């Protein structure tokens, strides 16, 4: 057995042992541990930020994009956000032990359905150190042990945060294997995690298409897929165009490097001539590059004279309709009808978050009913697809699959059920 196997199996054994304890631990016990983690993160803020500076400097040397560097960055505000996230999760109702239903059979047996933890959860993620804290909080509160494998870009930050969380858990009386961070950046460790069925009950990948596809295709451990977010906004012919502009600017520019950001804008032909020059000019103020279909390129180029705006437009390629930019780039297409918009989303969407801007009730209902996505919006930004925005506290990811969980995954999505049966001597 090689060293990586030994290293990983050791962590798997500890996690499995810890999960047995966590499955029945008192809710107050877990909440106290979460509060202590928050206190310890705050007390060690300078250490975390110092470790992050090393990762940021290395990231800049490697030429990471601005959006990736933004995801990697940890400052005082983001540490405080992590602390607040831990406290929020501590204050959420504990789902474990909840009896969902109970019924009595004619033979006198009482049967119930009870919520229980999944067991050991493996999280594989990229350059977002806050995931280390969010995943830990949700896994602990839902009674699961967690094995964390972050991206190499954030290794120093994750080590600093992981050590604090692991020590806090142990000092709170939790087993050693409750929270474990994989500290090696060797990519082979990921491939070995995908086969660790004996110890890991479910894997959750968070990252780009390459990471997610690798996990889904090669894992023998069950996977909850957090998919790529190629999100669309469709501006209907009846749309309030001021509302549409506000939503598009927010969805594209507030934080372009996240999975619920807007990537493709579809505009009905009836409003294209008036709306497209305005929206392209507006988003150019934020440095957004617009990749336009042939018709929209003609409309914009014929209406705009500002050299700066014109420098940020180009004609879209077929590849652009399938690209999650995670950057200040937006694909734009004119469509002839709602049907064409629905077909485009069907062909190119990733089942994450889709929005329609419309004042037409019938069109809004068709969009809600016919779009196959985890979150479908009428007259609101796709940026709301988020655990905290949905009232779940932190989230472990946004699932784009249909089995077990779909959409933002909070505490209840990290549980399963078992049947509990009470009898008084019945035999079959």
From Swiss-Prot:
Name this protein carries in UniProt: Gamma-glutamyl phosphate reductase
CDD domains to which the protein is assigned, alphabetical: ALDH_F18-19_ProA-GPR
MF (Gene Ontology): glutamate-5-semialdehyde dehydrogenase activity; NADP binding
Function statement: Catalyzes the NADPH-dependent reduction of L-glutamate 5-phosphate into L-glutamate 5-semialdehyde and phosphate. The product spontaneously undergoes cyclization to form 1-pyrroline-5-carboxylate.
EC numbers on record: 1.2.1.41
Disulphides: none
An example Gene Ontology biological process: L-proline biosynthetic process
Reactions listed under catalytic activity: L-glutamate 5-semialdehyde + phosphate + NADP(+) = L-glutamyl 5-phosphate + NADPH + H(+)
Highest taxon, organism lineage: Bacteria
NCBIfam families noted in UniProt: PRK00197.1, proA
């Amino acid at each position: 057995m090689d060293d990586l196997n030994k290293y990983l199996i050791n962590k798997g054994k500890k996690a499995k042992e810890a999960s047995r304890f966590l499955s029945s631990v008192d809710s107050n016990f877990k909440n106290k541990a979460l509060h202590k983690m928050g206190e310890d993160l705050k007390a060690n803020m300078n250490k975390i930020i110092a470790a992050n500076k090393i990762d940021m400097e290395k990231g800049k040397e490697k030429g990471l994009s601005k959006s990736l560097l933004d995801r990697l960055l940890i400052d005082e505000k983001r540490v405080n956000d992590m602390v607040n996230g831990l406290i929020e999760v501590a204050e959420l109702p504990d789902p474990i032990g909840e009896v969902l239903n109970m019924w009595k059979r004619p033979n006198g047996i009482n049967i119930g359905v009870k919520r229980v933890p999944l067991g050991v959860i493996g999280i594989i993620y990229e350059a977002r150190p806050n995931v280390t804290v969010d995943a830990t909080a949700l896994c602990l509160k839902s009674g699961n042990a967690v094995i964390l494998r972050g991206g190499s870009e954030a290794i120093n930050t994750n080590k600093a945060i992981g050590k604090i969380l692991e020590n806090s858990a142990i000092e709170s009386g939790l087993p050693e294997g409750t929270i474990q961070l994989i500290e090696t950046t060797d990519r082979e460790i990921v491939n070995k995690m995908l086969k660790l069925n004996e110890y890991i009950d479910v894997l959750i990948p968070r990252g780009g298409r390459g990471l997610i596809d690798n996990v889904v295709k090669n894992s023998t451990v069950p996977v909850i897929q957090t998919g790529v977010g190629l999100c669309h906004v469709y501006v209907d012919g009846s749309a309030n165009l001021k509302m549409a502009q506000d939503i598009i600017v927010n969805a594209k520019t507030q934080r372009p490097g996240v999975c619920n950001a807007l990537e493709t804008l579809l505009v009905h032909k009836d409003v294209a001539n008036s709306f497209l020059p305005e929206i392209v000019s507006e988003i150019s103020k934020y440095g957004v590059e617009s990749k336009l279909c042939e018709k929209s390129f003609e409309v914009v180029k014929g209406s705009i004279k500002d050299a700066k705006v014109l420098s940020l437009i180009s004609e879209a390629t077929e590849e652009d309709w399938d690209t999650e930019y995670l950057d200040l780039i937006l694909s734009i297409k004119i469509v002839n009808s709602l049907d064409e918009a629905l077909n485009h989303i069907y062909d190119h969407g990733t089942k994450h978050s889709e929005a329609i801007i419309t004042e037409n009730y019938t069109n809004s209902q068709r969009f809600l009913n016919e779009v196959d996505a985890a979150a479908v919006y009428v007259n609101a930004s796709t940026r709301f697809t988020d655990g905290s925005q949905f009232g779940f506290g932190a989230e472990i990811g946004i699932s784009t699959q249909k089995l077990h969980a779909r959409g933002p995954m909070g505490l209840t999505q990290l549980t399963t059920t078992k049947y509990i049966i009470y009898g008084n001597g019945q035999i079959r």
